[in-house]
């Protein structure tokens, strides 16, 4: 209950909303979850798809998009190279108006993806920036996002909590750093 009160305080202080997105790779489960009014969108990634036995990323994604037309659906690039991420992002974005392209805040070598975030955002590609662990990463992301382009900022509060850090103050700081970006959601 304390966490819920803290979230309400955060929302009241910042004017921003915290949204819940269901993460998965099973169409039947997604369709059941879609009926829950608290779910504001869906997200998946290549790892979840692989674990679910999905071999055709494009076919699965397009089936998902055919079934979920009224909520955001985040589809993740699977490349680690920044140029290839950019190429894949443009393809994913072309699959539907409700697609948010998931870009990790950095690649596996620790190279920030800010330049691609900036380019895609300026081109109007809706983005879901993922694997964020710190408020300073949020600041870096926000400096690269166009205020005109919708975005989802995916801070991994659960993983922050797993390190023994209370995620509520971190989330509050992240929301604060998102001010001035009315089309960005946490």
Language model features: what each stretch is:
Residues 2-31, 35-39, 43-123, 152, ...:
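Active-site beta->alpha loop and helix N-cap motifs at the rims of alpha/beta catalytic domains
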Residues 111, 118, 125-186:
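Catalytic alpha/beta core domains of metabolic enzymes, predominantly
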């Amino acid at each position: 209950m304390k966490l819920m009160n803290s979230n309400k305080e955060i929302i009241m202080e910042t004017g921003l909303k915290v949204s819940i997105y269901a993460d998965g790779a099973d169409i039947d489960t997604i369709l059941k979850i879609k009926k829950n009014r608290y779910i504001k969108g869906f997200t998946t990634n290549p790892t979840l798809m692989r674990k679910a036995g999905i071999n055709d990323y494009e076919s699965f994604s397009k089936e998902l998009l055919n079934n979920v037309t009224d909520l955001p659906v985040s589809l993740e690039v699977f490349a680690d190279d920044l140029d290839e991420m950019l190429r894949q992002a443009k393809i994913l974005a072309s699959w539907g108006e409700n697609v948010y392209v998931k870009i990790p805040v950095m690649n596996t070598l620790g190279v920030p993806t800010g330049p691609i975030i900036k380019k895609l955002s300026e081109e109007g590609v809706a983005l879901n920036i993922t694997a964020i662990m710190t408020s300073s990463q949020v600041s870096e992301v926000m400096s690269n996002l166009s205020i005109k382009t919708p975005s989802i900022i995916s801070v991994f509060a659960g993983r922050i909590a797993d390190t023994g850090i209370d995620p509520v103050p971190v989330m509050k700081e992240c929301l604060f750093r998102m001010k001035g970006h009315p089309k960005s959601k946490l």
